[in-house]
Amino acid sequence: MLKRSMNIADYDPVLWQAIQDENLRQEEHIELIASENYASPRVMEAQGCQFTNKYAEGYPGKRYYGGCEYADIVEQLAIDRAKALFGADYANVQPHSGSQANAAVYMALLNPGDTILGMSLAHGGHLTHGASVSFSGKIYKAEQYGITSEGLIDYDALRKQAHEVKPKMIVGGFSAYSQIVDWAKMREIADEVGAYLFVDMAHVAGLIAAGVYPSPMPHAHVVTTTTHKTLAGPRGGLILANGNEELYKKLNSAVFPAGQGGPLVHVIAAKAVCFKEALEPEFKTYQAQVVKNAKAMVEVFKQRGYNVVSNGTENHLFLVDLVSHGLTGKAADAALSRANITVNKNAVPNDPQKPFVTSGIRVGTPAVTRRGFNEEDVAELAGWMCDILDSMNKDNHEQVIADTKEKVLAICKRLPVYP
C-alpha cells in the first residue's frame, strides 16, 4: 500500500545520499557549463506530481486512453504559453529531449539519404546537426559547414557550399557559437537552393524569448529547442512553426506515433510552469544580465592575455582558446574543477588536439546569473580562473587552487542557488 509519508531517505539511504551530495555540489560549485541551469522549485514540484502516473498517447482532445481530461488542460496550457512566448502558430510540447525534437523534424521533412547541411560539431554545431556518430549523420547524407579562423560564420562560403551540395535542409543553430546568427541570410540561402531552413535554437531560446537575441521564428520553416539551458525549465524538447497546417500535421505525426509513444505529462506540466515564468518581466531582466555577465568575463580573459574565439560574445557563452598558452581543455577543465569551478573542455577552430582532449574551454553564464552573480562578481570569478590557468605547470599551482576554492565557497555561501 502507498502512503504519503513514504520517502527516499528512509527506504534507500544510498540513493538519498547521492541526491544530497548533488544538492551540496550545486550549492558549493560555480556552474559555468553553458548548457546547464537551475530549475525553479515550481518546475521541480511539477515534475514530481501525480501526472507521473498518467498515460496520454495522442494530443489534447484526441487521446487513445481515457481519463485524460486534466492532462489535456496541462498540455494545452504548455502549448498556448510556448506559442505566446516565441510568437508561433504551432507548438508541440511532447518531445522528451532536444535530440528527439530534431529527429522528429528530420522524419517529418526528409527521406533517408537526403542531404542536410549543418554546422560541424568541431566548429560549434551539435551532434544532431549531422555528426557522423549521430542518427543525423547515419540516416541522412550530412554535409558540414564551419566557421572562419576568426570564429565567424562565412555566409558567402555557406552559400557556395549550399549551391554545390544542394541540401534538402539547411540546419541553423549551435552548441558553441558566441555571435549573432543572421537567420534572414540563412533563409535566403535556403530559398536559393530550394531547401528547408530548420533552426535548433536550444542554446539561446531563453535569450530569444526575452528579446535579447534575434528570433529565427520569422525566417525558419521549423524551430526546435530544449526547455532547460537558458529557458531554465525541465529537461525536454519543443517544436515550433508558423503558417503551414500541412507541416503541423507532419510534425505531430513524426513525434507521435512515429518517434514516441506516451508523452511525459509531468514534464509537460513543468514546461507549462517554465513558459509562464519566461513570460514574466523579471525573466527579461535575467536574460539581459546573462549576456552582460558573459561580456564582462570575456573582457577579463582578454585583458589577461587569453584568446577568446571570435574575440567576444553576443550571447550567453564564449570559448577560450588555450593553444597559445600550451594548455589543453581537458587539463584546464580538471584544474578549475578542483577549485569548485565547473566548465567543459571544448574544441576550438583548427584544434590540434583530439576531441576528448581539446584546446579550449567553453564558459557560459546562465547558471551563475540565475543565482545572482552580477558583472562585478563574474569579473572577479574570471580573474580567479585566469589565476588558476596561469599557475598550471608552476610551483604555486596547488596553493592557487586552494586559495581560489576558499573564495568560491565564500561567494557561493553569499549567493546560494536555493536560499
Curated annotation (Swiss-Prot):
Cofactor: pyridoxal 5'-phosphate
EC number(s) recorded for this UniProt protein: 2.1.2.1
Reactions listed under catalytic activity: (6R)-5,10-methylene-5,6,7,8-tetrahydrofolate + glycine + H2O = (6S)-5,6,7,8-tetrahydrofolate + L-serine
UniProt-listed CDD domains: SHMT
Any one GO CC term of the record: cytosol
Site (Plays an important role in substrate specificity): 228
Family annotation (PROSITE patterns): SHMT
Gene3D superfamilies recorded: Aspartate Aminotransferase, domain 1, Type I PLP-dependent aspartate aminotransferase-like (Major domain)
Residues annotated to bind (6S)-5,6,7,8-tetrahydrofolate: 121, 125-127
InterPro entries to which the protein is assigned, alphabetical: PyrdxlP-dep_Trfase, PyrdxlP-dep_Trfase_major, PyrdxlP-dep_Trfase_small, Ser_HO-MeTrfase, Ser_HO-MeTrfase-like, Ser_HO-MeTrfase_PLP_BS, SHMT-like_dom
Localisation per UniProt entry: Cytoplasm
Main localization, broad class: cytoplasm
Alphabetic keyword roster: Amino-acid biosynthesis, Cytoplasm, One-carbon metabolism, Pyridoxal phosphate, Transferase
Pathway noted in the entry: One-carbon metabolism; tetrahydrofolate interconversion; Amino-acid biosynthesis; glycine biosynthesis; glycine from L-serine: step 1/1
A molecular function GO annotation: pyridoxal phosphate binding
Enzyme class at the top of the EC tree: transferase
Residues found modified as N6-(pyridoxal phosphate)lysine: 229
SUPFAM superfamilies: PLP-dependent transferases
Gene Ontology biological-process annotations: glycine biosynthetic process from serine; tetrahydrofolate interconversion
Subunit comment: Homodimer.
Family: Belongs to the SHMT family.
Function per UniProt: Catalyzes the reversible interconversion of serine and glycine with tetrahydrofolate (THF) serving as the one-carbon carrier. This reaction serves as the major source of one-carbon groups required for the biosynthesis of purines, thymidylate, methionine, and other important biomolecules. Also exhibits THF-independent aldolase activity toward beta-hydroxyamino acids, producing glycine and aldehydes, via a retro-aldol mechanism.
Name this polypeptide is given: Serine hydroxymethyltransferase
